[in-house]
């Protein structure tokens, strides 16, 4: 199973990594990152959800129709579900070798398999990549992609023939209920891992069930079932030490409706999903009350009750350092996997109070302060993203003058109504003080620009200055 790695935004936006420059002007990018002291001119429909068997699909295995007085048996679970679990592989047809493997299970009319999007992502994003299955009896076959849900890391693929008995989808069980995670990882064959439902994660941007069981590598996309045999979640991630995460089956039921409704343009569907998710995620930013803290002369917004977390990242100055700073970083745990090269949905911002430890000449201070004026950024493939476009300006924040640089990098693939999903970056540095400065850095990835500008403006509007 591919574990979705969170980008270390704290490290990327902290000084050691932020020193990485943007592409040079010689590459055609005008960043506007001049020294701070240098002044510039101001400037879906219905369908079968798979929740029950019907006349058009094979009867479910016996356990799927288990009654309350039927004794539970792991042996029966093993026998009933083994034929309905498949290994799903993405193959580079140019080499004949796999680039990823995971698990899948039969849903819908019996020709479909559910799996994780990240298991088959190479087939979406790369040429000459195809999707195949291996059954528990070692039979192999080709699969075609029907629909994806990148927000919840789900995909539905299909064969051109019936694969077997379909699973039934169920709801989230009571906290503490026993669950059984199934998969066909690597060359190990069909396995069952038992664990406990610990409920839906509360302070997270993603709907996930916390599962206390050892979801193993290659089990991504496999089902987790209750004692009645209903799929309550799809294996998606593991953090080790018997901590696993499941996507609630309700999201798969929604995707199944889309898959059954007809052909889907995958890139258009992904763009729609990203836009809809951004709108829902950022709506509370404009309505919720924000926690605030004071750093230097500024009172700044930090958390607002969602998944944002803030940390102190103040560097410890060396004895010989002429200047020092106190810094706060706030970032969300939200991430949407598109490919190994592209993960979007991140939101983070840094406040830094920079000051002279002892009085020094103004020119010397501004030289040191200018080193703080740089932007973090994601390395993007030129195949998938356009060039950076940056503008410099002078604005008032908290009643004080700031120099700003704002940069965008648009996606070439995910565009709707003329607006691309883009990465947005902003740095603002206070100017006019001789021995003290203040910087604000904001990073939003995979967002429509109009919404991103509103988010940045709302954040900056809440900042106030006061004399100590």
Residue ranges of predicted features:
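N-terminal activation segment of mature serine protease catalytic domains
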Residues: 22-27, 32-103, 264-314
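Catalytic nucleophile loop of clan PA
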Residues: 105-106, 214-235
